[in-house]
Regions:
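Short aromatic-glycine-enriched beta-strand elements
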Residues: 61-67
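Beta-strand secondary-structure signal
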Residues: 52-54, 66, 92-96
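Short acidic, glycine-rich loop/turn motifs
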Residues: 69-73, 97
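Structural detector for short beta-strands of small beta-barrel domains
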Residues: 47-59
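Extended, hydrophilic extramembrane loops/domains of integral membrane proteins
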Residues: 79-109
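Alpha-helical transmembrane spans
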Residues: 2-45, 109-150
Length: 150
């Protein structure tokens, strides 16, 4: 039978291992998501076209501009850009979009606007994965050192 102090010591080790497993699984899922996002972005880069556009207003500072452009088919599109960019009001910019869905796919033709999502998810996934493996490794080492050897 395990003593009270033995039970108290076992719980943190079990918790450390459990947290390590959860963080490793979450990190793995995020890394898979980042890989899928990167593949989607590569396909977008292959099939999209680039046209000139203009910043018509800043919604919440320079990182959230409203962009207007005209597609190659002559359609006028205006869309809000996400936060991985920094531009000034009235600036001329390049816009990249998929011809079959310009309003849904438009984004500035900059590294951050195009690859920011995949890199953010990948970076977070790597941190979760490494942190989880570290906790798992630490918990397993503590568990092994606490076992009685026969």
């Amino acid at each position: 039978m395990m003593s009270v102090s033995g039970r108290a010591a076992a719980q943190p080790i079990e918790m450390l291992i459990a947290k390590g497993i959860v963080f490793t699984i979450v990190g793995t899922c995020m890394l898979i998501g980042a890989a899928l996002c990167a593949q989607s972005t590569r396909e977008f880069m292959r099939t999209s076209v680039v046209v000139p556009g203009r910043v018509v207003k800043l919604n919440a500072g320079p990182h959230h501009p409203e962009i207007a452009f005209t597609t190659l088919a002559g359609e006028h599109v205006e869309y809000p850009q996400g936060g991985d960019v920094s531009v000034e009001d009235g600036a001329t910019v390049e816009v990249r979009y998929a011809p079959d869905a310009p309003e849904m796919t438009a984004r500035l033709n900059t590294f951050g606007a195009i690859w920011g999502d995949a890199l953010t998810i990948g970076g977070m996934g790597a941190v979760f994965f490494v942190g989880g493996v570290g906790q798992l490794w630490s918990g397993v080492r503590m568990w092994r050192s606490g076992r009685k050897r026969t």
